[in-house]
């Protein structure tokens, strides 16, 4: 006689067996229970083997998914371009703009042009710039000094260590730019590559290094693969990513850090306002770039964009409150921060005049590309622009040279406030057509190949 408990157990076994049959049939596999019955194996053992195989298969599939997610992101060959978005003649008139730009031409023809002057001048003028005087380098010549070791060697001599540093990691070619190592090097990490991106240099552009010709893509890959969210200088790396891969929503660093545009925005906003290069202004410029590109590439969620807008709006409020009656700012532009006011004795290495030119020019530059919703009242940039025009007009030639990197931001800002690139203004005044795209001739044997050692990731500055 079969008990009620035995009957229930038998029904349960039959039910479980039918569920397994259905699941296996749905998966397009043979029923393990029927296979077991045919082969004489216990049903339980076959089911366990099938489940183990399924779990192992899912684990393998998920591992492959994770590995694919961590593959380096692919950039675009052509960079995005940041555009001037307003024309406000009260900030600077046509006549004033012509006068300013004439004084700020890149008159660097001759031996040993400082590389930080060259890369600042390139992003200021663009590769299209041509000038009528013999002492000024054209935009093409400026770019060649940064991307062709032959031109660099001609200017700096064979004994100078090369600016371009080629190497490989496995089968991946790399190019680094020698940085913070004297007048023949760049002054900031990734500044040169960001400048090349801003003037529209494609990643297939040929770079003539001491070790041979390589595409600019090798410099991008080095920046991407060496990047860390804890770098001491990350503003220009952020700009490189924004311009060459704005369509990429997230990626992983080689350290395993997940990077999104929101993560980068928070990184830019988390420091004290005046901290960082040029009293924090390059972080503000990068945020303004993000907002402009967000309109096309949807970098942010609505909430993240609102957070960046609110941050920059607060910055503009502070700038309105701290603007000098004459129209300028200096290193104390943020006013009082969460940990107190800026120190009264704050002064940069080039003195108060340099600080004022730096802070005012940089401020007008990021405002020139920012959306209306973050800008201050109309009179604030007008006063700043008119102060810059008067101050630049009063500088001696020696002071122009001394402050050139600061002034490159001021000149570019003033042109952008008239809705044009500096090279376009020169073309309007001279009647000369902007220079078209030019690429260097094939490489020739070069020196210093053995000296072109690639800096390691450990050499990156940390905060």
Question: What residue ranges belong to the model's regions?
Answer:
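Preference for long, amphipathic alpha-helical scaffolds in soluble/luminal domains
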Residues: 20-22, 28-463
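N-terminal intrinsically disordered, acidic low-complexity segments at the extreme N-terminus
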Residues: 2-29
């Amino acid at each position: 006689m079969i008990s009620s408990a035995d009957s229930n157990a038998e029904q349960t076994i039959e039910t479980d067996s039918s569920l397994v049959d259905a699941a296996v049939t749905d998966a397009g596999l043979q029923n393990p229970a029927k296979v077991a019955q045919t082969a004489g194996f216990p049903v339980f053992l076959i089911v366990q083997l099938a489940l183990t195989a399924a779990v192992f298969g899912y684990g393998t599939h998920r591992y492959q998914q994770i590995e694919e997610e961590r593959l380096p992101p692919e950039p675009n060959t052509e960079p995005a371009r940041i555009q001037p978005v307003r024309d406000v003649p009260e900030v600077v008139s046509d006549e004033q703009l012509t006068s300013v730009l004439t004084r700020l031409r890149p008159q660097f023809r001759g031996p040993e042009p400082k590389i930080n002057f060259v890369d600042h001048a390139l992003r200021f003028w663009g590769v299209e710039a041509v000038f009528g005087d013999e002492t000024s380098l054209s935009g093409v010549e400026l770019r060649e000094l940064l991307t062709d070791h032959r031109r660099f060697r001609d200017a700096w001599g064979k004994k100078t260590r090369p600016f371009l540093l080629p190497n490989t990691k496995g089968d991946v070619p790399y190019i680094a730019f020698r940085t913070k190592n004297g007048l023949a090097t760049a002054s900031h990490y990734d500044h040169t590559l960001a400048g090349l991106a801003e003037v529209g240099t494609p990643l297939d552009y040929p770079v003539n290094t001491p070790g041979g010709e390589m595409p600019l893509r090798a410099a991008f890959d080095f920046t991407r693969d060496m990047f860390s969210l804890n770098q001491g200088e990350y503003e220009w790396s952020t700009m490189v990513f924004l311009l060459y891969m704005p369509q990429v929503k997230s990626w992983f660093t080689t350290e395993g850090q997940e990077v999104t545009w929101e993560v980068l925005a928070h990184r830019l906003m988390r420091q004290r306002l005046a901290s960082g290069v040029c009293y924090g202004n390059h972080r503000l410029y990068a945020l303004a770039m993000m907002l402009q590109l967000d309109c096309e590439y949807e970098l942010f969620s609505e909430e993240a964009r609102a957070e960046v807008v609110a941050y920059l709006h607060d910055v503009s409020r502070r700038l309105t409150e701290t603007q000098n009656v004459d129209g300028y700012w200096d290193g104390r532009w943020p006013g009082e921060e969460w940990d107190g006011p800026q120190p009264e004795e704050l002064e940069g290495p080039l003195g108060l005049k340099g600080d004022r030119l730096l802070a005012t020019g940089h401020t007008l530059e990021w405002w020139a590309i920012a959306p209306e919703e973050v800008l201050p009242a109309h009179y604030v940039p007008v006063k700043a622009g008119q102060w810059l025009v008067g101050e630049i007009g009063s500088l001696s030639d020696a002071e122009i040279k001394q402050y050139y990197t600061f002034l490159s931001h001021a000149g570019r800002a003033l042109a952008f406030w008239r809705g044009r690139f500096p090279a376009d203004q020169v073309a309007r005044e001279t009647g000369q057509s902007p220079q078209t795209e030019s690429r260097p001739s094939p490489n020739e044997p070069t020196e210093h190949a053995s000296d072109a050692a690639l800096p390691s990731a450990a050499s990156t500055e940390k905060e």
